[in-house]
């Protein structure tokens, strides 16, 4: 049973990342989040890796909230980790891939899928109403915010 929980948790984690990016980072639901994210959007080259660190604070808060919920419920430890682990994995994968998009000679640049995703991400920098997904794009496809059109000069050294 607990193993089956991982699959929807992966889906829900991606949906949560999409929701945060679309409505948390692009609005001021958390004071200062939009301003910080706007700085990130102003950078259309691949040297923006240092401006994404505020997410670590959000991660810390989120996981502590999950821990508190766990302590005050009757969820088994196995079930808790089957929900908690996929969320951690998705977050860190998104964080790693997003940071890699902004490192000029990152080792992932040797892969076509990564270079393509990097272009899609950089399109979001020039059109912040499209491509909110970071490491996957199914949320954008589901919510009609995906665009495969790449603006000219959207990124250097792809």
Stretch-by-stretch model annotation:
Residues 21, 37, 98, 121, ...:
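Divalent metal-coordination and catalytic microenvironments
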Residues 27-32, 103-158:
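Membrane-proximal soluble regions of multi-pass membrane proteins
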Residues 11-25, 84-104:
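Transmembrane alpha-helical segments that form the membrane-embedded catalytic/substrate-channel core
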Residues 51-72, 137:
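Core segments of transmembrane alpha-helices
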Residues 36-48, 119-127:
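Short membrane-interface loop/juxtamembrane segments of multi-pass integral membrane proteins
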Residues 19-43:
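Membrane-interface helix-loop junction between the first two transmembrane segments
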Residues 1-6, 67-83:
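Helix-coil boundary and interhelical linker segments in multi-pass alpha-helical membrane proteins
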Residues 1-13, 26-33, 81:
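Hydrophobic alpha-helical transmembrane segments
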């Amino acid at each position: 049973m607990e193993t089956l929980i991982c699959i929807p948790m992966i889906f829900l984690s991606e949906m949560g990342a999409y929701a945060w990016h679309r409505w948390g980072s692009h609005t001021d639901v958390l004071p200062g989040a939009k301003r910080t994210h706007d700085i990130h959007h102003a950078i259309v080259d691949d040297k923006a890796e240092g401006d994404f660190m505020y997410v670590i604070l959000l991660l810390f808060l989120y996981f502590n909230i999950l821990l508190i919920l766990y302590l005050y419920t009757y969820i088994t430890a196995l079930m808790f980790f089957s929900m908690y682990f996929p969320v951690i994995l998705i977050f860190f994968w998104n964080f790693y891939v997003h940071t890699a998009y902004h490192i000029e000679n990152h080792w992932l640049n040797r892969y076509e899928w990564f270079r393509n995703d990097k272009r899609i991400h950089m399109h979001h920098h020039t059109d912040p109403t499209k491509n909110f997904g970071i490491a996957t794009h199914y949320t954008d496809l589901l919510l009609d915010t995906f665009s495969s059109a790449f603006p000219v000069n959207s990124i250097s050294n792809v």
